[in-house]
């Protein structure tokens, strides 16, 4: 760390890192970054990769390729990347650092939602009828690292919807669990309730 500070003392990312999750858990600069004077070629992230707050993600002197480096400490996420529905990290369209700033940490629900909406702007609203889980946190319904369900849902319809909408005293108080639909087409909630992120119509109906 001391050797790094000889060049990076004024870098705000360094002081932020020491206060953030990686720093508090005992990681040092050299946990991810090798020597800047090593004979191996320097690997840079794409110059167009920026964090939402405007600070460029400069992956200089990394020991491994960017995403492989993340997965070396977070191996549980490697399996998520093999699931049928996932963000295209393996294809190189985005990277771990497109959503996660390695020098910061401790994301709140609000910052997680804003991070998702920076790409999915059409889901932002404001809406006349808010869907409570969406207003709280996108990950109430979505598993961003990979899922077996379409749309990166945590589980398939209608089970995801029914995890909240069963009894009147449940979290969101919409009693629909006893409703019976005979035709298979009506066994998907989104057949009628398509505007699940929010709506200007009644109860998130499609029309």
Pin down the residues of each PLM region.
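Short sequence/structural segments immediately N-terminal
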Residues: 1-207
């Amino acid at each position: 760390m001391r050797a790094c500070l000889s060049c990076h003392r004024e870098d705000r990312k360094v002081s932020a890192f020491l206060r953030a999750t990686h720093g508090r858990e005992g990681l040092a600069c050299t946990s991810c970054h090798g020597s800047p004077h090593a004979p191996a070629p320097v690997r840079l992230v794409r110059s167009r990769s920026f964090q939402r707050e405007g600070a460029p993600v400069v992956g200089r002197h990394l020991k491994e390729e960017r995403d492989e480096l993340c997965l070396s400490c977070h191996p549980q996420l490697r399996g998520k990347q093999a699931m049928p529905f996932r963000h295209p990290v393996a294809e190189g369209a985005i990277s771990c650092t497109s959503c996660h700033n390695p020098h910061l940490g401790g994301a709140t629900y609000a910052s997680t939602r804003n991070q998702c909406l920076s790409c999915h702007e059409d889901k932002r609203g404001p809406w006349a009828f808010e869907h409570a889980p969406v207003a709280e946190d996108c990950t109430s319904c979505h598993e961003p690292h990979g899922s077996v369900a379409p749309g990166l849902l945590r589980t398939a319809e209608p089970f995801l919807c029914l995890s909240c909408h069963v009894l009147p005293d449940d979290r969101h108080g919409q009693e629909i669990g006893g409703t019976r639909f005979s035709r298979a087409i009506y066994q998907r909630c989104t057949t009628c309730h398509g505007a699940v992120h929010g709506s200007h119509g009644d109860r998130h109906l499609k029309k």
